């Protein structure tokens, strides 16, 4: 079946310095709409500080399956789970002292930590490819952070390109 992909970004985004960007009312309206799409199990294309991501509710098997289908990604290739904070990440991953020190130093930012899953982890096993580990990240991008916050759930988000293709760094390169 066909899946709807909502692309979340202002058309001028690539011209802005994302680290100085503030979210205006129009962007907030788009983010709220995209968060609802995430909650409804749909896919959303959104910017991070590195590449554009293809996001879905990380706790939903159906939503995660849509990511793999849309990208043509092998299901044995786990996804990165984007969260809002270290505190939230600790609900899903077991942090050693070293991992916690690294997270405090580099998050938010373009670092993914691979950690053992917590026993109460609610992330779809499909998102972690059935592994006992989980890839966690706290992005440093205002749109990504606001989307995760508004969706009120972790977002599984690989890059928004077909599997094996170059990761998109511009809005127009996101999966059609």
Label the predicted regions:
Residues 21-176:
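Active-site-adjacent structural elements in enzyme catalytic cores
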């Amino acid at each position: 079946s066909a899946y709807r992909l909502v692309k979340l970004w202002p058309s001028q985004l690539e011209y802005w310095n994302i680290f100085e960007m503030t979210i205006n009312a129009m962007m907030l309206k788009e983010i709220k709409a995209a968060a609802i799409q995430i909650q409804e199990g749909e896919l959303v294309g959104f910017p991070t500080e590195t590449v554009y991501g293809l996001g879905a509710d990380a706790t939903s098997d159906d939503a995660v399956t849509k990511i793999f289908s849309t990208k043509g990604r092998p299901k044995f290739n786990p996804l990165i789970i984007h969260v809002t904070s270290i505190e939230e990440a600790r609900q899903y991953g077991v942090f050693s002292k070293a991992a916690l020190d690294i997270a405090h130093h580099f998050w938010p930012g373009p670092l993914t930590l691979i950690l053992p899953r917590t026993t109460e982890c609610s992330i779809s096993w499909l998102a972690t490819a059935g592994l006992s580990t989980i890839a966690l990240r706290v992005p440093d991008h205002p749109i990504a952070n606001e989307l995760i916050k508004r969706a009120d759930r972790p977002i599984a988000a690989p890059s928004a390109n077909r599997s094996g293709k170059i990761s998109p760094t511009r809005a127009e390169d996101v999966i059609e």
